[in-house]
Amino acid sequence: MRAMACVRRVRNFCIVAHIDHGKSTLADRLIERTRAVEERLQHAQMTDNMELERERGITIKSHAVCIPYTDAHGTEYVLNFVDTPGHADFAYEVSRAIAACEGALLVVDATQGVESQTISNLYLVLEHNLEIIPVINKIDLPTADVPRVLQQVEHDLGLDPASSVLISAKTGENVDALFDAIITRIPPPQGSGTAALQALVFDCHYDQYRGVVVHIRVFEGQVTSGMVIRFMSNGAEYRVEETGVFVFNLIAREALCAGDVGYLSANVKTVSDVQVGDTITDASCPCDTPRAGFRRVKPVVFSSVYPVDTDECEQLREALERLALNDASISWERDSSLALGHGFRCGFLGLLHLEVVQQRLEREFNQTVIFTAPQVQYYVFLKTGQRIVCDNPAHYPLEQEIAQVHEPYIRATIITPTEVLGAVMTLCIEKRAYQTAVNYLDQKRVELVYEMPLAEILFGFYDRLKSISHGYASFDYELIESKLTDLVKVDILINGKPVDALAQLCYRPHARRRAQAVCARLKEEISRQQFKIAIQGSIGGQIISRETVSPFRKDVLAKCYGGDITRKRKLLEKQKEGKKRMKMVGDVEIPQTAFLSVLKEASDA
């Protein structure tokens, strides 16, 4: 593989699909057929190199790979492909990968057919005018229904079914025909190797020894070791120490030229100098204009994160900063809690995104953290006429100051088998959804369109949908306008003192049930003390639920054998007074498991 391959023999493409349709398995077959990796080093799901991805069986990060390919005529090509996530929470990863490519393999499972995320990914690809190759995968399975899926490709996706390539990524059947389609149908990159350098930053990661390693797609010119580059958004300049391509490890190359996808290392230690979507150019001969960057995504789920050890707040900040390099969709700002100390208020693209960030902080950065219950952004209109945006219960105004509250709504698209249609509709009604459309796609599948509050899908909706449909229903959503709601703040009090980290904003008719569930869970987690512990849920000072943790009781009458009853009363009164004093000065320690259990309770509600 030459460092500066002729641009006409380069193909850049991404692999996109609904979750579990076989993207990563297809990536394995492409690598295997081109012998990009020695046979002894090959294993399943090679592009899923994160431990968390292997555990969950899903792709979380987009992974770029450079492989050589020689066609039947002996012509050598360089194929740069990106394996992308399939879950809706990681759609931003897909959009960034698409910006670095000229083509896309749209993979559809021959047993499942077209699903909601297939359609969403199609729209992303069409926005960037990429050449689309429909790939019908898993044709080796007995339950594969290729004619039905080809009909869906034409009817649901608007693509020519004759352009589809039928393969089995598992067995490798017909993969050679897919290579031919990639070479003949995906156009080579445009650009000149002699023009001024113009490279798009589409991802990056932090290396302990090299600093920030920047992932780039070169559109014009070339970048070589020793060149001084400039980040066009902030003017920061660095000398390039190494350039190269991705073949699972970083493989150094002399240069990257127009059309190449690779990386550069310039000993960048200031993390804030590198921004995904920025343009890199030659400091001595800069290009005229930067590339159009990525549309900044807005987080939809918010949660506060605190270190268990309050002295480790600065280490948590550094960890979030480095994590944000590799996950540009996360946002964060400083926050504080009376109960948990200093921390950060973080924004995520969904509940799965939140869970992944939590686990990455613990595994990759050795941070033991506590996450509060996730919330969405509410729009609060005060009686003074002021409008405020609130995603943190600690900042929610007093009820008497509020004129009205609006909450974000989504347009949810659910594709489900017809035999579970009734159960799916019942679930949606429970979640305050109202139906806007029903489309029967064929005899076995129906598409439901609902408008529903975003907050209702945060807790258990996706899991219940999969359970009801035995895994066959698919779900996708997009944000629409906000609508009027009846919102209240539920405070949790421990011995009369509110714990701000346990407060939640929720729909008024659900408030009592939520408060009772949280109090019951806390009762199980908080250790007994020498005094009684009252756990209460309240709305605006009104107690709506209560649980009590019984105290330990010392038998002060153990040494009284008979005798006057007044002696026993005196001992009991003395014990009672002592417990009162203990309660006045005693602080209840709330364990980390209690916060985690409340988060789980919210998910189950």
Swiss-Prot record:
Catalysed reactions, as listed in the record: GTP + H2O = GDP + phosphate + H(+)
UniProt GO MF annotations: GTP binding; GTPase activity; ribosome binding; translation elongation factor activity
Role played: Required for accurate and efficient protein synthesis under certain stress conditions. May act as a fidelity factor of the translation reaction, by catalyzing a one-codon backward translocation of tRNAs on improperly translocated ribosomes. Back-translocation proceeds from a post-translocation (POST) complex to a pre-translocation (PRE) complex, thus giving elongation factor G a second chance to translocate the tRNAs correctly. Binds to ribosomes in a GTP-dependent manner.
Highest rank taxon of the organism: Bacteria
Location(s) in or outside the cell: Cell inner membrane
Keywords associated with the record: Cell inner membrane, Cell membrane, GTP-binding, Hydrolase, Membrane, Nucleotide-binding, Protein biosynthesis
Gene3D superfamilies assigned: 3.30.70.240, Elongation factor 4, C-terminal domain, Elongation Factor G (Translational Gtpase), domain 3, P-loop containing nucleotide triphosphate hydrolases, Translation factors
Annotated Pfam families: EFG_C, EFG_III, GTP_EFTU, GTP_EFTU_D2, LepA_C
Domain tr-type G: 8-190
UniProt key word Cell cycle: no
Main location: membrane
NCBIfam families: lepA (TIGR01393), small_GTP (TIGR00231)
GO biological process: positive regulation of translation
A single Gene Ontology CC term: plasma membrane
Residues binding GTP: D20, H21, G22, K23, S24, T25, N137, K138, I139, D140
Protein name as it appears in the record: Elongation factor 4
